């Protein structure tokens, strides 16, 4: 009996019709492709994009040159030099991030005890040469100053999960 059923099923091309029905169902379904430069998907507050260095509200930079971010970076993309100030505190003289090495893992952000280094929602940035993708301390501070409101809002939304 099974052979007869199989014979008539293959004779009338039932499998072919089932496959075409499945294809037709997906043909008229809603498309999931996003045309990226024109359309943008919403980003999470935890999005890991371009790095920024933050300042305190009084204008002083947050980084205390503990070098935890440099130590924890698996790609060795962060370079920090520091020196002692007259008041005994240690501050950075050089803070470079090489974005050609960076894998945007977020370990630097997690290890920072004073919330100095953060990853922003900035996704689109480019460089004409390799050297353009090495971000220095003044560049990172400028990004932090420009996007501080958005960074603070994202940190506040994420605070209950940290």
Curated annotation (Swiss-Prot):
Its EC number is 7.1.1.-. It catalyses: a quinone + NADH + 5 H(+)(in) = a quinol + NAD(+) + 4 H(+)(out). This is NADH-quinone oxidoreductase subunit I. Belongs to the complex I 23 kDa subunit family. PROSITE patterns: 4FE4S_FER_1, 4FE4S_FER_2. One of its GO terms (cellular component) is plasma membrane. Its main location: membrane. It is found in: Cell inner membrane. SUPFAM superfamilies: 4Fe-4S ferredoxins. GO terms for molecular function: 4 iron, 4 sulfur cluster binding; iron ion binding; NADH:ubiquinone reductase (non-electrogenic) activity; quinone binding. The gene is nuoI. Keywords: 4Fe-4S, Cell inner membrane, Cell membrane, Iron, Iron-sulfur, Membrane, Metal-binding, NAD, Quinone, Repeat, Translocase, Ubiquinone. The keyword Lipoprotein does not apply. Its cofactor is [4Fe-4S] cluster. The lineage of its organism: Bacteria, Pseudomonadati, Pseudomonadota, Betaproteobacteria, Nitrosomonadales. [4Fe-4S] cluster 1 binds at residues 63, 66, 69, 112. It is a peripheral membrane protein. It comes from the Bacteria. NDH-1 is composed of 14 different subunits. Subunits NuoA, H, J, K, L, M, N constitute the membrane sector of the complex. The keyword Cell membrane applies. GO terms for biological process: aerobic respiration. [4Fe-4S] cluster 2 binds at residues 73, 102, 105, 108. It comes from Thiobacillus denitrificans (strain ATCC 25259 / T1).
């Amino acid at each position: 009996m099974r052979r007869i059923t199989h014979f008539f099923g293959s004779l009338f091309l039932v499998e072919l019709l089932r496959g075409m029905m499945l294809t037709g169902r997906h043909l008229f379904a809603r498309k999931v492709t996003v045309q990226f430069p024109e359309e943008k998907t919403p980003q999470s507050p935890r999005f890991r994009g371009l790095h920024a260095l933050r300042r305190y509200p009084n204008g002083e930079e947050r980084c205390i040159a503990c070098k935890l971010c440099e130590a924890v970076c698996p790609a060795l993309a962060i370079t920090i030099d520091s020196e002692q100030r007259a008041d005994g505190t240690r501050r950075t003289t050089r803070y470079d991030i090489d974005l050609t090495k960076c894998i945007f893992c977020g370990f630097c952000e997690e290890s920072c005890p004073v919330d100095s280094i953060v990853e922003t929602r900035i996704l689109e940035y480019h460089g004409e040469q390799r050297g353009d993708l090495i971000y220095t301390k003044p560049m990172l501070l400028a990004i932090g100053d420009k996007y501080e409101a958005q960074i603070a809002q994202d940190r506040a939304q994420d605070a209950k999960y940290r």
